[in-house]
Amino acid sequence: MSQALPLVTRQGDRIAIVSGLRTPFARQATAFHGIPAVELGKMVVGELLARSEIPAEVIEQLVFGQVVQMPEAPNIAREIVLGTGMNVHTDAYSVSRACATSFQAVANVAESLMAGTIRAGIAGGADSSSVLPIGVSKKLARILVDVNKARTTGQKLKLFSRLRLRDLMPVPPAVAEYSTGLRMGDTAEQMAKTYGITREQQDALAHRSHQRAAQAWAEGKLADEVMTTYAPPYKEPFSEDNNIRGNSTLADYAKLRPAFDRQHGTVTAANSTPLTDGAAAVILMTESRAKELGLAPLGYLRSYAFTAIDVWQDMLLGPAWSTPLALERAGLTLADLSLIDMHEAFAAQTLANIQLLGSERFARDVLGRAHATGEVDDSKFNVLGGSIAYGHPFAATGARMITQTLHELRRRGGGFGLVTACAAGGLGAAMVLEAE
């Protein structure tokens, strides 16, 4: 069993999150159509620095992520530094942990702060499902390499003659797990069947997510954490997420057919996250550095945990695995939390994790723990809606959740909050946040 692990520097400074910002999230091929992730990243980091009024030289490191990477910009972090007017000497590197990428970016900056190598940094992520690295078939790729080595026109023509029409078809990015061939939706279907989660339960959670997200926007709760953007042809501002269905009814969800298991499935496009474009980032500092600069932190990073499980069956159980570890490291229990924000990749996945957090059997037989993590209080859970409503630009979701949770904690007078997510490859992430 792990013990509480205080996240502080050698001088006893807490890790402060002083501000956070994101672009509005856009459904694939809508408001951000044609804008690559690196440009979305530049948008949000540039605006974050402008709003914070922090001198560029104060930021000593930028860790950024992108899941669907573009070959022409393999280090999105460095491109953001070079494209936003930041100090050219700012250290910058990129990370990828699938849907938990910006969780990892935040953890990396926090570790640099604790090590004392920096006193302030930026973490975040961006993804575009509208600008994708469309590839070629393996056969064509191999022949193109061989053609480059061929010496004569005859040799080149002979190589090209081996190709068939099907070899010339473009190859979009894979939507399946590399190691298993399973799509994420296939795993969600597995989980629905394993844990007895009905179509009605999934649709109800999705409807709840959209209703709460719509209410959050209507009440102005997201205005300070979402920037206004202008995308080509620069005629209209884009300032609110365009996936939220505030006027939908439960009956609307019931009309959709299963998207993965066509005959017996329960996972639909409406109770899953859509493909989305967007970016998000946060500024982290040591507590003393924030005080020197006269900054009031949004909150503090209390603990974090990353876990991994097998990918063949029910692999999206990351929250059920990582949450108890993060709570233990924070010296807290689930009951101590004021808010719980869980990434909604699919309604089925979300409901399965909620079920297992309260399962004594899962805790004992799978996690090797004496007691269940705890029953999730609905009044604390995804109170502003979740990814099913907002959308899910893979690398940006974690930073969105962190910023959103800290703002809501402050509105409620402070306390502790949990942000947690599943990720491809059987990975899981959880962070405990604190606001005063």
UniProtKB/Swiss-Prot annotation:
GO biological process: fatty acid beta-oxidation
Record pathway: Lipid metabolism; fatty acid beta-oxidation
InterPro entries: Ac-CoA_C-AcTrfase_FadI, Thiolase, Thiolase-like, Thiolase_acyl_enz_int_AS, Thiolase_AS, Thiolase_C, Thiolase_CS, Thiolase_N
PROSITE patterns named in the record: THIOLASE_1 (PS00098), THIOLASE_2 (PS00737), THIOLASE_3 (PS00099)
TM segment ranges: none
EC annotation from Swiss-Prot or TrEMBL: 2.3.1.16
Chief location category: cytoplasm
Classification via Pfam families: Thiolase_C (PF02803), Thiolase_N (PF00108)
Record field: catalytic activity: an acyl-CoA + acetyl-CoA = a 3-oxoacyl-CoA + CoA
One Gene Ontology term, aspect cellular component: cytosol
Subcellular location: Cytoplasm
A molecular function (GO) term: acetyl-CoA C-acyltransferase activity
Superkingdom, taxonomy of origin: Bacteria
Catalytic residues as annotated in Swiss-Prot or TrEMBL: C99, H392, C422
Alphabetical UniProt keywords: Acyltransferase, Cytoplasm, Fatty acid metabolism, Lipid degradation, Lipid metabolism, Transferase
Main enzyme class: transferase
Alphabetical list of NCBIfam families matching this protein: AcCoA-C-Actrans, FadI, PRK08963.1
Family (UniProt): Belongs to the thiolase-like superfamily. Thiolase family.
Main function: Catalyzes the final step of fatty acid oxidation in which acetyl-CoA is released and the CoA ester of a fatty acid two carbons shorter is formed.
PANTHER family: ACETYL-COA ACETYLTRANSFERASE, CYTOSOLIC, ACETYL-COA C-ACYLTRANSFERASE
Quaternary assembly: Heterotetramer of two alpha chains (FadJ) and two beta chains (FadI).
Protein name stated in the entry: 3-ketoacyl-CoA thiolase
Originating organism: Citrobacter koseri (strain ATCC BAA-895 / CDC 4225-83 / SGSC4696)
Lineage, highest ranks first: Bacteria, Pseudomonadati, Pseudomonadota, Gammaproteobacteria, Enterobacterales
Gene that encodes it: fadI
